[in-house]
Amino acid sequence: MTKFRFAAVSTLVLAATLGAAPAFAQDSTATPAAAETEDDGVIVVTARKRDETLSDVPIAVTAIDGDTLTARGINSVREAAVLSPGLNINSDGSGRAFVAIRGVGVTLVQSVQPGVGLFIDGIYQPNTAYLNNPLLDVARIEVLRGPQGTLYGKNTLGGAINVITRQPSDVFEVRANGSYAGPDNSWLVSGAVSGPIAGDVLGFRIAASHRQQDGFLTNTLLNKDANRFNTDSINATLRLAPSEGFSLTVKGYYDWVDGVNVPYSRVSGPKDYRRDVQFNTLNEISYKYRGINARAEADLGGGSKLSVIGAYDMRNSFSPDSDGDFGPVNTVRTVGRDSLRTMTLETRLDSEWTDQISTLVGVFYSNEATNADVTDTISLVHPVFGPISIVRNTVSKNVADTYAAFGTMFWKPNSDWEVALGLRYDRENRVSRSSISGTILPTAKLKSSEWQPKLTVSRKWTPDLMTYVSVARGYRGGGFNAPTAPTRTYNGDSAWTYEAGAKYATSGLMLSGAVFYNDYKNYIGLNSIAPAAGGGLVTVDLNSGDVESYGVELEAMVRPVRNWTLRGGFTYMHARITDDSAYVGTTGRQLSSDRLTFQPDWLANISTDYRIEMGGDDEVVLSAGLFGKGKRLAATLNETTPTILDSYWLTNASIAYRTGPVEVALFANNIFNTEYFESYIEKTTLLLAGLPASDLGITGDRRRYGVRASLKF
């Protein structure tokens, strides 16, 4: 099947490359910019569900355009996090990611609803697994910091990430990209074809990609790669615009992801950066993502526009044989499969009533269904009876319905001031049915009703300078623990955020900054371990208590001369648990630190691009980037001594030659081969589980170097 997928993708990419005839309109590759721009260079974003310039929108937002992603070799949202202040994403498996913005919305396991929302073309993705998925044919990424629940709904208390893909074009367009890097045999090929079918009435776009890498970890027990990664993606879009005031866009996609789950090495401490894994199995896991969505937009006249978005998304995963004890002793083995099906429907009405007042109102509905079937085999040695095997099969089905109504009024008393007042009401009903080895358990239910208000006041002091203040509340829904857990449910968490910011934009200079304070209640943080029904132990999610997070962030783009661009961002955030009584009361254990798991106190990035004109359309571009992350608390259940991971800096660089629509580049990532941990679990967790005790760590990627080429007509 993998060979068939690769062949299909390669055929499309090859067709895109060979089909590029001189008759197609040429569009020379632009210097990487911050986001999609209008003809005069003004950056346009849709952070408030309407087109606005980046310098005018009163939200802390970072916009990264598709050409920048390609030039930087960024292939997933997780990888793009280094370019956005305040956004922290780590991962310990192909379908797992930890995400937070400004220390809020912390999501450590995939069973917990995300605290930072991910939206692809306006459609909510309900699981952190999507953060690792390949980015295909992306126009730009927008990272919105602070609660966005008023317009985006629940599960955005930390912020929201918008991924906007390229739409069908009015002229024929072809894009092709390819790269190869070592020493882990990492390569990528992608392509897209777009153009009209019937003039400007009907257009199409098709894109596909293949990516694979061996990774930098080795299973020394099996003499195999322990962190390989393989993806294939394809999507197709049709856009119908029979009249000037109406359009219908339909898109379908299919992603295959084959990789490894939780490839932890047994390490002696947080400075032991070994890359050997000793599992009895390869811990392989495969995912299939597919879906279809449609967006209808109509100009109703009188200053009103109606948008209706419907989507169906499906994710299936299968793990044929997983090692649950993280070592050579064959104690815990797991076989499992699950599915997540999501259907959403949203209707929005954007109306301009007068020159001073406009509104955006809408309703939303989603239905999620999760099915899981997991079989655990626990092998023990009894002192009297000898070897004993416990086989436990757990089947669960969770269903969730969410209903919401929302509205925002925008009031501009004059050309300088704007007041935006929004409110959203979400009602969520969740039901879980499950069984353990054929024994049906009582049905678990969870209901919530939440209001999410937001008030923003902004002033345009000059055409170049804007300031704003805002207060907003966001919340994340609760959920269910495994059927074997003693506590089946946990509640949602919420945050009030207070923010003041400023933006300045002129030719050759863009500056933005913000100060923020978050009052974070019922924090869903570090999970714990509890006795499992039927024997053994089980991981439980729970509300840990309250958190206070405050800080400052800065973002800048400077162009000292026409051919030289500098960009940078910095966030300092002090996120600490102020009340852990909920955690202590539930687990009977103490926390060894008031820090949040995997959350640094600072994040920083700086990059430079210098263009050397060679005459005509030819140029050489010298690029470099420096990305840093502060010290972090490892995942730990130790009650007295916290485990702190070191801070680190990564350095990337490239040199590219461009001639017309063609670009060829040499690049290197993590040039100085810096050692750091992507994820880390302190040994108390294994000790409590009755397993051979050892710290567990996953090291980040080593130095990678290679060549990259792109073509765009």
PLM regions and their residue ranges:
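N-terminal Sec signal peptide and the immediately downstream disordered periplasmic leader
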Residues: 1-84, 194, 244-245, 292, ...
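Gram-negative outer-membrane beta-barrel transporters
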Residues: 360, 412, 418-419, 517, ...
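Structural signature of Gram-negative outer-membrane beta-barrels, strongest in the C-terminal barrel
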Residues: 239-243, 253, 349-352, 364-366, ...
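Membrane-embedded beta-barrel scaffold of Gram-negative outer-membrane proteins
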Residues: 190, 293-323, 460, 466-472, ...
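Transmembrane beta-barrel wall of Gram-negative outer-membrane proteins
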Residues: 173-175, 181-213, 217, 221-259, ...
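N-terminal periplasmic accessory domains that precede
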Residues: 77-78, 98-100, 116-119, 143, ...
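Short acidic/polar hinge/loop motifs at secondary-structure boundaries
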Residues: 121-147
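C-terminal beta-signal and adjacent terminal beta-strands/loops
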Residues: 521, 626-637, 656-713
